Amino acid sequence: MSTGVLQFVKGIDFSGNDFSGDRFPHDVEQMTQMTWLKLNDSKLEQVPDELSRCANLEHLQMAHNQLISVHGELSDLPRLRSVIVRDNNLKTAGIPTDIFRMKDLTIIDLSRNQLREVPTNLEYAKGSIVLNLSYNNIETIPNSVCANLIDLLFLDLSNNKLDMLPPQIRRLSMLQSLKLSNNPLNHFQLKQLPSMTSLSVLHMSNTNRTLDNIPPTLDDMHNLRDVDFSENNLPIVPEALFKLRNLRKLNLSGNKIEKLNMTEGEWENLETLNMSHNQLTVLPDCVVKLTRLTKLYAANNQLTFEGIPSGIGKLIQLTVLHLSYNKLELVPEGISRCVKLQKLKLDHNRLITLPEGIHLLPDLKVLDLHENENLVMPPKPNDARKKLAFYNIDFSLEHQRKIAGQMTSPSSSISSVHSGGARQDALARRKEFIRRRKQQADQQSADKVIQGMSKIAGVGAALTEKQQEEEERQLEAKSAVNWKKNIEKNRRHIDYSDIFDEDVGSDEGMWVWEIENFYPSIMDEAFHGQFYDADAYLVLKTTREASGQLRHAIFYWLGEHASLDKGMCSAVHAVGLRNHLNATCRTQREEMNDETEEFLTLFGEEIVYIEGGRTISGFYTTEKPAHLTRLYRAGVNGTAVEMEPVPLSVESLDPRFCFLLDAGETIWIWSGYKSRITVSNKARLFAERLNKRDRKGKSEIETCRQARCPPEFWQALTGNPDKPQGAIVEHVPEGFVAERKKLYKVNIGMGFLELPQVELPKGIAKQDMLGSKGVFVLDSNSDIFLWIGKKANRLLKMAGQKLVVELHQMIDRPDYAQVYRETEGEESMMFRSKFAGWDEIVPVDYTRTSDSVQRVPDLKVIVKKDNMMRADLAALFLERQPSMSYEESEELMEDCNYDLELMESFVLEGKKFVKLPQKEFGIFYTMDCYVFLCRYAVMPEEDEEGEDEHDEDDKPEMDFKCVVYFWQGRDASNMGWLNFTFQLQPNFEEIFKDKLEVVRMYQQQENHKFLSHFKRKFLIKRGRRGLTKNLGGKWPELFQMRANGSSVCNRTIQVDCQANQLCSAFCHMLRIPFKEIEEDGHRGVVYVWMGKDSDPREHEFARQVASDLVVRDDDNDFRIVEVQEGEENEEFWKVLGGKKKYETDSSFVKHTRLFRCTNEKGYFAISEKTVDFCQDDLDDDDIMILDNGDAVFLWIGARSSDIEAKLSYQAAQVYHASMRMKANEKPRKFMLAVRGRESCRFRKCFHAWSKMKEPMG
């Protein structure tokens, strides 16, 4: 359906569409008045034939396509002014020669093609002002080109293979921009340059320039503003450049300049100076005189602190400063006075610190300081403390120490911060004093003005009061008048002659009107008494009294189904009829089925009701269109949810994706069995917002998985409740990218329309691109939206409605593509999802507790509870938990075993628990589960009066209690626990009743009482007990004995049989079975390796563990050999894969600490794990901070939230700064530990580190 609007289109931007093959819209030939057309990045393979009918076309862009020829159609465009076909596959033969003879042709862009020579007849384009032939393979420029194109203003020949330029180039006296970069130009002396007096841009980067082929003087080139002589290996700055007074931009990077010999008064107007990649050691002091300089690049030189002018702070206009890859150890304090600085790069230097004022630069956005190993950042001033607030939490070290209740000493480094802050506070007080004085002066001036106005107002009020008293006296003197006469005199007479005839009510009779389109329409007498229930009527009955006067009765009748406008108009016109007749009667309301007797007598008590309505309403009636069921494929791009429309069929489903089926009353979320749960959850949230915004909450939201789809889903999708027979297969291509969105803006002028595109940076549309006074079209190929602003005029709206219809029809689209109309402020959820950040997200403070979220009338009440801004970081400032001494450990072990009467052990074999042999007591396997039944004596309670009053026979008997310890290996499944709860536990409960206690423990997380029963003989082997006993023992095994915090926690755990697993702080056992029995009958050997820093008191226990536990029950013929660190034999290292580097620094054992960061309590809190922590204490739901004495690691769990990660990062920095103060002699690095890729420095803090567990699901 044609709207007839195409003939008025003056220009349109079709860039970004897919016009490959025969997809170019044929309706373009109807745009006969079109003067400009953009077809950039449209996959064109040839010039469309339709362009030959656009005879008025003046500007044509076909860049970034696949054109190999532009013959034919371009020759049929006589008014062509600009041809832009850059970045194609054009060769010289593919360019028609006759287009250059067009007298109006002014812009020619053939850059980024495959031209080997200048196109034929180019010299005939004498009216050209722009010529771009860059990025081709052109080797020569004909003399005729420069001789004839004397009107050129812009000439770009860069990135070709030119070795020479014709001497006629001097004729281009009007040339303003000349770009020749990246050409050999070995034989071009640049002698013609001084004749180009209009030249303002000269780019000759990488053109083999030397001091000999650059003119010695450029005095006549007063307009030269942009010069690029980079990548030319120049030893010094050419002398001619210093005389360019109007120079704005100078690029001399990539040369061999050692010194910048500029003097004061030169380059006064310079704004950009690039001296990167040279050999500069000093920047001259006169650089600070370049007061207009905004960008200074001096990276990759040899600058030191002395080489930077101390007065650099005078460059107040400086926004960009690059000093990377130099030899800077310090930077001048003046840099902090460059108040407009936005980007500062100081990476790859030798910086030690920075000026304190660097934090006060208001506009600084980029500060690059990486690869400065010894850099110590200055503390931020107290004035900026509010900027440290992070999620309503102040993470400054001083504030957190104050909260933790620790006061800093005067000698600490914090005191220096205070002193600096005092200076800042003094300055702030001066500023505040000046501000108050100014405010006070303004207030005094305002008081004087108000006082003067009050006086004037007082005088005026007195005069007004006297005038009112005088008027009241005059009114009292006048006689009272009839109020009815005043009303009659002031009544506004309205002419009703256009509505009612003159003879209406002038004699006896009855008149009936029906309301039609807001006005009464007189009815024939034949229809009196017939009333439609959807209409309203006006009735006038006039009778003559005996005195001869006329008496009127006016009624208005409302049908049961009459529309609002008919009822209102009947009442209004009844009053108008009374005024028209100058009647004194009242208007009476009559309703269907409730008429008065007086009204019924008018029609002889015979009224006929007819269903329906005979007249039309004055309102426009619209019928809500039927809902169209649509299917969308959900995708996630960052935090945004993208809904891609797909055909409504089973074939569109893919098991790797989630889909949203919008069936109107029900919104279905379908998830394939390979889809991600996060995508499904976000699709569900999108459906919730869609239902709330577009459906007012009337739709139901249902979710279903691929394996279980209810019949209702198939009914909505296919119209049949039965599940389709065919399988759902993967069909969406890998790496599928939806077609790029295009945003058009509708422009209207005197008799023409334009449809340009709004530039979308990186293809991202934002809400602020829409304007209330405009009309926009968002085209996503499968859907097209017309957005109308509130302040758009009527003609613009009409033009947008017609253009969106034409745009929908002329471009090839899927059959399911739809057109939607959006109004500003009432946009649909689907339209909003096309724009980044356009969503109704309520900001939430995740650090608040449930109490603070309650609705409290006064916000101060919440703040007093200290919940809104609460963060518990006190654990970071506590001292490390001291290790238990050997004597204390012995005493604790004795106390824990004092009340033990009996201990029975069981192990899970198959699905049953069997009694564990006594010789295996203390041996555990990581894939098994064990049960230990312990009977403890309970001491009787003593009376307060003492025991003397009791006889020996009356002494209370000893009681007991039973504790069942369930031990689960790290690699064991939960089936063991289920078998225990259904088999053993019921039996134990039946026997011991209320004296039973069940304690479940995991590997390396046992309590002290349980460990005390094994008296340091606690061995954990890898694998399963039954399988290892039958098939194991035939290969070398390495065990590490380690006690964390207390010797009670002594465990011997099997580790990888490699040399790098050794540690000088602990004892190790290496079990080596021999392939053949030795002559002395030994079948193997167990080496007990004593680390040089291990506790000598642990050596005896290491020998016992080796002989009792490491040597298997059938390995009594293994000999035990003690080895001191450094005295190993060749056999020892050979079994471990050769001698390798292992951990010899044992100091980390005394400093290791592990902190847990979480907000599970409703606020952010940090707690410290016990010294006896293990690998499984790294919780995937939280963030951990590990300190090993040399580095502070931040470990991020796989399921932790972004909020926890950000807060933990700030807290780790607080801890790092705190430890720098406490232990300045042992500085720590701040590092990140990636889950699953932890470094050896991180892993050494955990006993027997192994592969990380993967979370279920």
Curated annotation (Swiss-Prot):
Segments annotated as LRR repeats: 6-31, 32-54, 56-77, 78-102, 103-126, 128-148, 149-172, 174-195, 197-221, 222-244, 246-267, 268-290, 292-315, 316-338, 339-361, 363-384
UniProt GO MF annotations: actin filament binding; phosphatidylinositol-4,5-bisphosphate binding
Gelsolin-like-type repeats, residues: 523-600, 640-714, 759-832, 1168-1243
Domain of life: Eukaryota
Any single GO BP term: actin polymerization or depolymerization
SUPFAM superfamilies reported in the protein's UniProt record: Actin depolymerizing proteins, L domain-like
Transmembrane region(s): none
Any one GO CC term of the record: actin cytoskeleton
UniProt keyword Repeat present: yes
Keywords: Developmental protein, Leucine-rich repeat, Repeat
PROSITE patterns: LRR (PS51450)
Gene3D superfamilies assigned: Ribonuclease Inhibitor, Severin
The keyword Hydrolase belongs to this UniProt entry's keyword annotation: no
Similarity comment text for this entry: Belongs to the villin/gelsolin family.
UniProt function note: May play a key role in embryonic cellularization by interacting with both the cytoskeleton and other cellular components.
Protein name stated in the entry: Protein flightless-1 homolog
